[in-house]
Amino acid sequence: MSKVYWVTGMSGVGKTTFANILKKKLNERKIVSILIDGDELREILKKENSYSKEERIEVAMIYSKLAKLISNQGITVIVSTISLIKEIHSWNKQNLKNYIEILIKRDISEIIKNDERNIYKESEVVGVSIDAEFPEN
C-alpha cells in the first residue's frame, strides 16, 4: 500500500536530508518510492523567484496533485517542501490516501547560524518575512 510522506518545515531545517534518509530506509525495506524535492521541482517549473502566497499555493498544489497521481499508481511518494500553507495541508489530508505529514522544526537562530545557502539574507523568506502556517497536528 503506497503512502505519501509530506516532509515540511522552514528553509534550512533539514527536510531534504530527512527525506533522503527516509527514502533510503524505504529502499532497504524493498518499498518502491520516489522523492519529490521542492527546490528541484520549483527549478523545473521555472518558479524559482515566485513567492507571493498565490504562487506558493499554485506550486504546492502541483506537488500535491503530482504526489496523488504517483501514489494512486502504487508508488510511495516523499515530498520535501516548505509549503507551510494551511490550505495545502487541508487539501492533502482530504485527498491523499495514507498521508503522513512530518514537520521538521529547529530554532530560528540555529537555522540562521547554519544558513550555508544564505537564504535568510534574502528579503522574502517563509517564517521570517512571509507568514508560515505550521501544520496543526
Region spans (language model):
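Conserved nucleotide-binding/hydrolysis micro-motifs of P-loop NTPases
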Residues: E40-R42, S83-K86, K105-E110
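Hydrophobic anchor at the beta1->P-loop junction of P-loop NTPases
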Residues: Y5-V7
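Conserved lysine of the Walker
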Residues: K15
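Walker A (P-loop) phosphate-binding loop of P-loop NTPases
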Residues: G12
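Glycine-rich phosphate-binding loop used to anchor ATP phosphates in small-molecule kinases
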Residues: I44, S52-I100, I119-E124
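Small-molecule kinase domains that catalyze NTP-dependent phosphoryl transfer to phosphate-bearing small molecules
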Residues: K105-I108, I112-N137
